[in-house]
Amino acid sequence: MTSTATFREDFHSLRAGGLNWDSLPLRLFGKGNAKFWDPADIDFTRDAEDWQGLTEEERRSVAMLCSQFIAGEEAVTQDLQPFMAAMAAEGRFGDEMYLTQFCFEEAKHTQVFRLWMDAVGLTGDLHSHVAENPGYRAIFYEELPRSLNALHDDPSPANQVRASVTYNHVVEGTLALTGYFAWQKICRSRGILPGMQEVVRRIGDDERRHMAWGTFTCRRHVAADESNWDVVQEQMQHLLPLAVTQIQWRPEDAPEETPFRLDIDELAAYASDRAGRRLGAISAARGVPVEQIDVDASPEQLEDQFGVEDAAALEKA
């Protein structure tokens, strides 16, 4: 087998005009740098005390929720790397810069959940909380790695759209951000777990930047070729039933009344509203000049608006 070495021809940072700091990926990169936070700075002492005050069923519910969160963060940390290679193949160095930060933040989210779990004593094997959930298995064990790893062999626009819909719009937008919002609302309404409240607030802020990049990437490809809008819709239609299965699944021995009295209908409405508005932003890119998409701040502004709306809702919790 003969291997052909690939040599570097030039440097993006040395080209005339330098880097385009007005492009959305580099704006997100700058915003992420300005909002840096360290998981080790968060105090979980009160959380460990509050944990002891939860009922056995409440602790099991929290353990399941956190297991799904941390395993998801670990999975996306591992699976994101093919997208970086796809951006390199396109010559999009600004996207590469942002995705390095993106991946670092996912690893940091894994760290902070593990620190919290260690602090409250969740140190046993927790695989049953994810492995027995058929929706979770389908998305995180199969669909996520499949869609991202497809970029290794074929980083085509259609495959990038499928990967972004899977990663950004289903895993992050439909599952993670909805779950984080619900969990923070529960903690605030009961006045418990202040460390976890800070964790979720900071992670949510990071994830909204990730979502902005995912929406931007889909918009870029839809603007270049309207047939990619069909790819967006097909992938969403394929994955959403799996997401619903994950959310609705409960262990066979779970009590009839959901711990914390979580309103599933309210969560479904929240997720549907956010997904619909993000998909609307992608659809709106049809017919827009591609060069205009690169500096269009609308995906970033949409996520900022979601942050404002979440903060207002949590104030009422």
Curated annotation (Swiss-Prot):
<dbReference type="GO" id="GO:0016491">
    <property type="term" value="F:oxidoreductase activity"/>
</dbReference>
<feature type="binding site">
    <location>
        <position position="109"/>
    </location>
    <ligand>
        <name>Mn(2+)</name>
    </ligand>
</feature>
<dbReference type="InterPro" id="IPR012348">
    <property type="entry name" value="RNR-like"/>
</dbReference>
<keyword id="KW-0479">Metal-binding</keyword>
<feature type="binding site">
    <location>
        <position position="73"/>
    </location>
    <ligand>
        <name>Mn(2+)</name>
    </ligand>
</feature>
<comment type="function">
    <text>Probable oxidase.</text>
</comment>
<comment type="subunit">
    <text>Homodimer.</text>
</comment>
<dbReference type="Pfam" id="PF00268">
    <property type="entry name" value="Ribonuc_red_sm"/>
</dbReference>
<feature type="binding site">
    <location>
        <position position="210"/>
    </location>
    <ligand>
        <name>Fe cation</name>
    </ligand>
</feature>
<feature type="binding site">
    <location>
        <position position="106"/>
    </location>
    <ligand>
        <name>Fe cation</name>
    </ligand>
</feature>
<keyword id="KW-0408">Iron</keyword>
<comment type="similarity">
    <text>Belongs to the ribonucleoside diphosphate reductase small chain family. R2-like ligand binding oxidase subfamily.</text>
</comment>
<feature type="cross-link" description="3-(O4'-tyrosyl)-valine (Val-Tyr)">
    <location>
        <begin position="76"/>
        <end position="167"/>
    </location>
</feature>
<dbReference type="GO" id="GO:0009263">
    <property type="term" value="P:deoxyribonucleotide biosynthetic process"/>
</dbReference>
<keyword id="KW-0464">Manganese</keyword>
<dbReference type="InterPro" id="IPR009078">
    <property type="entry name" value="Ferritin-like_SF"/>
</dbReference>
<dbReference type="InterPro" id="IPR000358">
    <property type="entry name" value="RNR_small_fam"/>
</dbReference>
<protein>
    <recommendedName>
        <fullName>R2-like ligand binding oxidase</fullName>
        <ecNumber>1.-.-.-</ecNumber>
    </recommendedName>
</protein>
<dbReference type="InterPro" id="IPR033908">
    <property type="entry name" value="R2LOX"/>
</dbReference>
<feature type="binding site">
    <location>
        <position position="207"/>
    </location>
    <ligand>
        <name>Fe cation</name>
    </ligand>
</feature>
<dbReference type="GO" id="GO:0046872">
    <property type="term" value="F:metal ion binding"/>
</dbReference>
<feature type="binding site">
    <location>
        <position position="106"/>
    </location>
    <ligand>
        <name>Mn(2+)</name>
    </ligand>
</feature>
<feature type="binding site">
    <location>
        <position position="172"/>
    </location>
    <ligand>
        <name>Fe cation</name>
    </ligand>
</feature>
<keyword id="KW-0560">Oxidoreductase</keyword>
